UniProtKB/Swiss-Prot annotation:
F-type ATPases have 2 components, CF(1) - the catalytic core - and CF(0) - the membrane proton channel. CF(1) has five subunits: alpha(3), beta(3), gamma(1), delta(1), epsilon(1). CF(0) has three main subunits: a(1), b(2) and c(9-12). The alpha and beta chains form an alternating ring which encloses part of the gamma chain. CF(1) is attached to CF(0) by a central stalk formed by the gamma and epsilon chains, while a peripheral stalk is formed by the delta and b chains. Keywords: ATP synthesis, Cell inner membrane, Cell membrane, CF(0), Hydrogen ion transport, Ion transport, Membrane, Transmembrane, Transmembrane helix, Transport. It is a multi-pass membrane protein. This is ATP synthase subunit a.
């Protein structure tokens, strides 16, 4: 059985799925109220949380428009932006002693990966049509189609593994790193490790967001749109 560090969720249950679900919901609630606070009293000259959120949104759209174009970057921002923010908050909550990152659970990162996987295929089929979308899987050379098509299918399914395990592995490793540091220096606040984990939390949220846009671009942009 996997050893788990004691968290506040253990006051209610020691079940693995319950603990993961507890922090998934807690993170969503925290994100909702923080986001609500940032947008509750909008000002022409942004200050405080509003300024932070507007800077984040501008940064995401600035990067995304280079991948998929400004119009589509804004269209798919509700998905990519929400996932980026949620992954960030999920990563950050695990830094707090007594809390656990939902993204340190592979079952949760798998759900996020599946959401992206099914959504970009849905959008690709909706925009291009079923047959035209899957015709791209066969490649430009017809006689290579029997070889290219299964390779493309495997490649797309491997994205689920790549997305979920990359996030899970990095955050799980970060949590173990923090635990070891706290055990080694329990009498002092390890500021440097906390800064490293904060940076890694931002980086993993950024990578997940970028890959979401990349997969969407590959699905909805035709050859003429590139």
């Amino acid at each position: 059985m996997e050893h788990r560090v004691f968290t506040i969720a253990n006051f209610f249950s020691s079940n693995h799925d319950f603990i993961t679900g507890f922090f998934v919901v807690l993170t969503a609630v925290l994100m909702f109220f923080i986001s609500l606070g940032a947008s509750r009293k909008m000002q022409m000259v942004p200050m405080g949380l509003q300024n932070v959120y507007e800077s984040i949104i501008s940064a995401i759209l600035s990067v995304a428009k280079d991948i998929i174009g400004e119009e589509l970057a804004r269209k798919y921002f509700p998905l990519a932006g929400t996932i980026a923010l949620y992954v960030f908050f999920s990563n950050m909550i695990g830094i707090i002693p007594g809390f656990e990152s939902p993204t340190a659970s592979w079952s949760f990162t798998l759900v996020l990966a599946l959401i992206v996987f099914f959504y970009y295929h849905f959008e690709g089929i909706r925009v291009q049509g079923f047959f035209k979308y899957f015709a791209h899987f066969a490649g430009p050379v017809k006689w290579l189609a029997p070889f290219m098509f299964p390779i493309e299918i495997i490649s797309h399914f491997s994205r689920i593994v790549s997305l979920s395990f990359r996030l899970f592995g990095n955050i799980k490793g970060d949590d173990m790193f923090l635990l070891i540091m706290l055990l080694l220096v329990p009498w002092a606040v390890p500021v440097a490790p906390f800064m490293v984990l904060f940076f890694m939390g931002i980086l993993q949220a950024f990578v997940f967001m970028i890959l979401t846009y990349v997969y969407l671009a590959g699905a909805v942009l035709t050859d003429e749109g590139h």
